[in-house]
A protein has these predicted regions:
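Structural transition elements
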Residues: 328-361, 376-381
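Long beta-strand-rich cores associated with HINT superfamily self-processing modules
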Residues: 499-527
Length: 527
């Protein structure tokens, strides 16, 4: 059940398309009746049924679970956000932005945007959704006190103000034709003006919050006042966390839950061979990366970083760890198939001799090194760490692997040690990905890597209206990250979900498993 790989919007509404429209008409308007499809057309499916309750198990569940969009950082958080809140735009299966709470976006220069809101939309408590809610929801991410996970994205928002009863004018610091894509980011969903207590989950999404126990369970019931006619279909959804892959699979096949994510590639045959159950593969830009920070003098050495990259046996990872459900990576975050992928960048191969030379040069061979922290919650990271350990032993490199519990890993270990693994969900565009994870001042800059030329290219690419020039800029950024960056990205991993075949309407959106975390409003129960 494979779908097309994440193509960054290829075949959809590209930057060049946007600029052509601006040039031809003096004004670009993207809306439900215009160049972008209506939201529902992207998810057309036969004869949805109404009613029923399902339980869904996600691998990411901990006491850090949140209902505050600014604080969300896991797939489970994003699932909650799309259950209880709605964004101005929404991505479809081709990563083309669709209008959602916004009825249209208009601009003449990609810097000043007029956002027209849908009329008649209400929050779960009955309050109408208005311009003040949008202004607050976008601009709160700029406030350092909010500690937003998407502050680097929000820094682009120079000013937002209500300019009509259903209208917001958003002015950017510099032109960015990707704004419709950026507004689909999970953290940028719309909340009530002035909200600081998110415990009630008041939004205007397809489900209303019934109960929320961080690390245990989230229950939502259908919002009968949802603004999309006929949706959602289910009466109730319970989202639980089961970090152990085997336990999560057993919960599915025993009938305890009806949908799970992050299936171990070694278990795919068990799912497909069990009557009544099916596997959903979504090819994507998901990657698990080895993070090499500068906290340790040996790890800080560029020769150590490059040596570790050569130590990865990428083909072995693809076949043995991911069982073919991945494509080989090249230590930069743009996957093959993406329209800005740099195919001319030479692929780094497994080269133990070169790795040994570089690691010897860095003083790493025979030295006591900090352990590599890995967890089952970062797809394949434990297996990657063990394979690196085994490859290192052959050349005199002593690597220790610390298998950390998934509960609290992202709060207590990720980015907190010289050697850790990350697990990065795909982003809606190259700009969003590079801004959140590689810009020098990004909170999620995993390795703490800083490169002034990279930052300059990133900012220049946003306002570049010539798509060929922009592709060259993104290509140059990929070269810089691959050759000078401090993360090893050996593979891009398919999302693997398992589901009860009575659950219908489950599609693929390459930003994440479970339909890009947006399954809640799209699935129904054929009992």
């Amino acid at each position: 059940m494979s779908d097309d790989i994440d193509n960054g919007g290829k075949g959809g509404f590209t930057r060049r398309d946007m600029m052509k429209v601006m040039a031809a008409g003096g004004m670009m308007a993207v809306g439900a009746g215009g160049l972008l499809m209506t939201p529902d057309s992207a998810f057309a499916a036969p004869a949805p049924k109404r009613g029923g309750k399902i339980r869904v198990a996600n691998e990411a569940g901990s006491t850090a679970d949140t209902l505050d969009p600014a604080k969300g950082s896991t797939g489970a958080d994003y699932t909650r956000f799309f259950m209880f809140y709605s964004g101005l735009t929404q991505l479809d299966a081709s990563l083309t932005p669709q209008m959602n709470l916004a009825e249209s976006l208009q601009t003449t220069d990609a810097k000043t945007w007029i956002i027209k809101l849908r009329k008649g939309v209400t929050f779960h408590d009955g309050k109408p959704v208005g311009p003040a809610d949008v202004v607050y929801s976008l601009m709160r991410h700029k406030n350092p006190a909010t500690a937003s996970k998407v502050k680097p994205l929000a820094e682009q928002f120079a000013e937002a103000k209500a300019t009509g009863p259903d209208e917001v004018t958003l002015t950017l610091a510099s032109a960015n034709a990707d704004l419709p894509v950026i507004l689909a980011t999970p953290q940028l969903v719309i909340v009530k003006d002035g909200t600081t207590d998110f415990s009630t989950g008041i939004g205007c999404g397809p489900y209303k919050l019934k109960s929320f126990k961080p690390g245990v369970s989230t229950v939502g019931v259908r919002n009968d006042s949802y603004f999309k006619p006929g949706k959602p279909y289910l009466d109730e959804i319970e989202l639980i966390g089961i970090s152990d892959s085997a336990a999560r699979l057993n919960a599915l096949l025993s009938g305890d839950v009806h949908l799970i994510n992050a299936i171990d590639p070694r278990s795919t045959q068990r799912v497909s061979s069990t009557p009544g159950y099916a596997l959903k593969e979504t090819k994507s830009g998901l990657y698990t990366d080895l993070i090499m920070r500068s906290d340790n003098p040996i790890v800080a050495n560029p020769d150590f970083v490059e040596g570790m990259k050569y130590l990865f046996d990428r083909e072995q990872l693809r076949t043995a760890v991911f069982r073919g459900y991945s494509v080989i990576g090249n230590d930069q975050p743009i996957p093959p198939g993406h329209r800005y992928f740099n195919a001319s960048l030479p692929q780094r191969a497994h080269d133990p001799d070169k790795a040994k030379f570089l690691l010897q040069k860095a003083g790493a061979l025979g030295a006591t090194l900090p352990p590599i922290y890995a967890t089952s919650d970062a797809n394949g990271s434990i297996e990657m760490a063990v394979l690196l350990q085994q490859a290192g032993q052959k050349i005199g490199l002593n690597l220790q692997v610390n298998r950390a519990s998934p509960d609290g890993y992202w709060s207590n270990h990720w980015m907190k040690h010289p050697l850790t693994f990350g697990n990065i969900n795909p982003r809606s565009s190259a700009d969003v990905l590079f801004t959140q994870f590689f810009k020098s001042d990004a909170p999620w800059n995993e390795s703490g890597w800083k490169n002034a030329k990279f930052d300059q290219l990133l900012l220049a690419a946003r306002s570049e209206t010539d798509d060929a020039k922009r592709k060259q800029m993104y290509g140059d950024m990929q070269v810089i990250v691959s050759q000078q960056g401090r993360v090893g990205i050996p593979a891009f991993i398919s999302f693997l979900d398992g589901y009860d075949k009575r659950l219908a309407g489950l599609g693929s959106i390459p930003t994440g498993g479970m339909m890009g975390f947006m399954f809640a409003e799209n699935v129904w129960w054929n009992a």
